[in-house]
């Protein structure tokens, strides 16, 4: 079966990691020129930037901010690391809300040397600890 060329970009979203060598401004410019309608911003593209201004930049091109990537990483061998992860996820939620992203993409995984059961429990606990803020700010976790 031959694949048909993509001609309808109305629901296309590109992650900034796809064009790792481009900064946020360059990615937004090129994606918009190509007719991409949505963007998922990876958190490192926001370093040193105001998330609200980043969202404004994206919307100024007619694109939608689809999500902010990545949150999660809740499992850890040490309690201190789990607490730091929860605080980092709260910052991601706040950044997503500021830029107008309706979703934070969670990449949860597991930790070597820890049982899958324990990692899953820590993921559940981490989401439970961050969900009230996400709900209050209107940001989904997925």
Cite the ranges covered by each PLM segment.
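Conserved, mostly hydrophobic/aromatic
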Residues: 14, 31, 39, 58, ...
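Structural preference for beta-strand elements that scaffold enzyme active sites
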Residues: 9-13, 38-40, 62-69, 102-105, ...
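Boundary/entry segment of secreted carbohydrate-active catalytic domains
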Residues: 2-24
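General N-terminal targeting signals
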Residues: 29-31, 36-41, 53, 80-82, ...
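Acidic (Asp/Glu)-rich catalytic clusters
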Residues: 2-8, 28-33, 48-68, 90-100, ...
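Acidic-and-aromatic substrate-binding clefts and catalytic sites of carbohydrate-active enzymes
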Residues: 17-23, 41-53, 73-80, 111-115
């Amino acid at each position: 079966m031959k694949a048909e060329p993509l001609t309808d970009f109305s629901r296309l979203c590109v992650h900034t990691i796809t064009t790792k060598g481009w900064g946020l401004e360059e990615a937004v410019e090129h994606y918009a020129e190509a007719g991409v309608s949505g963007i998922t911003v990876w958190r490192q593209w926001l370093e040193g930037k105001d998330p609200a201004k980043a969202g404004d930049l994206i919307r100024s091109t007619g694109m939608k901010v689809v999500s902010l990537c990545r949150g999660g990483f809740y499992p850890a061998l040490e309690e201190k690391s789990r607490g730091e992860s929860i605080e980092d996820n709260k910052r991601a939620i706040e950044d997503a809300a500021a830029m107008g992203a309706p979703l934070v993409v969670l990449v949860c995984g597991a930790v070597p040397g820890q049982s899958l059961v324990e990692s899953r429990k820590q993921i559940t606990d981490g989401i439970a600890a961050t969900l009230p803020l996400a709900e209050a700010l209107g940001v989904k976790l997925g």
